[in-house]
């Protein structure tokens, strides 16, 4: 019998809504200080410039009011843990759209997006369905995915500019937990315990299940290293060599399971 599909943990809606706005504000403040030369500079995301990345970040938040303004679909098609794997199929469309975003005035763009987001979510129910390009999901779940987009791309922006943009604690927590739960769903089991303090602990990989005492197979890392591994920004071997990941036990090698999303 195949293993039961993992049920997503619950997220505090009020905190998630606030976290999206808080992280976007952090990015907005940093973007306002970027010079034209910095905006035209490269990123680690292929051919994207910093300006492309800035536009993409705005779009990730702007998608909330835009989807809420569209008619609601008839039925839910996506659970929260389905989302990470579905993004890969939309990569080409996302790239094309990002390159077409008008970001000549980043400050004006971000001011408009922040205002539209706050107005749109103010009276919207978590159960409201949104029609994404690859399926329908609830607003509550979609907002959790926005924390992933914002935190991961904040890290990209920091890497490209050295801006030192801070991470909202709640946004970083939600991002970490969703990607950790995605790993547990992708490789169900109890042989390996993955610890990402202070936000998440999950068990994964088939094999003997740990019940008490110290687990025989343990992986531990920090949240930013985890999101870089989970999204392919870095590689398992490199982070092990840099001592950003500790892995003990014969099954504690996650290299074959990563990345979880691109």
Give the ranges of each region predicted by the language model:
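Short, helix-capping/interhelical loops that line the mouth of catalytic, cofactor-
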Residues: 2-15, 62-115
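C-terminal interaction segments
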Residues: 2-6, 70, 88, 212-262
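An N-terminal domain-cap segment
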Residues: 2-51
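Hydrophobic packing residues in well-ordered alpha-helices of helical domains and bundles
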Residues: 17-20, 50, 107-110, 114, ...
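Short, contiguous alpha-helical
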Residues: 40-80, 129-178
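Internal, conserved structured core segments that host functional sites
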Residues: 94-146
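A glycine-rich beta-turn/hairpin centered on an aromatic-Pro dipeptide
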Residues: 170-198
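Glycine/small-residue-rich hydrophobic helix-like segments
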Residues: 188-225
């Amino acid at each position: 019998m195949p293993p039961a599909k993992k049920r997503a943990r619950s997220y505090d809606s009020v905190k998630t809504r606030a976290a999206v706005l808080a992280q976007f504000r952090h990015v907005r403040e940093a973007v306002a200080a970027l010079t034209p030369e910095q905006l035209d500079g490269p990123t680690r995301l292929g051919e994207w410039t910093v300006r492309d990345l800035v536009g993409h970040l705005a779009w990730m938040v702007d998608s909330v009011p835009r989807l809420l303004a569209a008619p609601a679909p008839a039925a839910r098609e996506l659970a929260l843990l389905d989302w990470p794997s579905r993004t890969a199929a939309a990569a080409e469309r996302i790239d094309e759209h990002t390159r077409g975003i008008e970001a000549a005035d980043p400050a004006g763009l971000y001011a408009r997006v922040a205002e539209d987001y706050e107005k749109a979510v103010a009276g919207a129910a978590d159960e409201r369905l949104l029609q994404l390009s690859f399926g329908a999901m609830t607003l509550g779940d979609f907002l959790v995915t926005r924390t992933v987009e914002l935190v991961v791309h904040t890290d990209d922006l920091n890497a490209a500019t050295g801006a030192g943009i801070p991470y909202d604690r709640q946004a970083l927590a939600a991002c970490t937990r969703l990607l950790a739960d995605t790993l547990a769903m992708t490789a169900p089991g109890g042989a390996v315990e993955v610890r990402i303090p202070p936000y998440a602990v999950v068990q994964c990989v088939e094999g003997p299940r740990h019940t008490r005492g110290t687990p025989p197979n343990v992986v531990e890392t920090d949240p930013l290293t985890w999101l870089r591994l989970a999204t392919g920004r870095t590689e398992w071997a490199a982070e092990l060599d840099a001592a950003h990941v500790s892995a003990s036990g014969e099954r504690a090698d996650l290299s074959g399971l990563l990345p979880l999303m691109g």
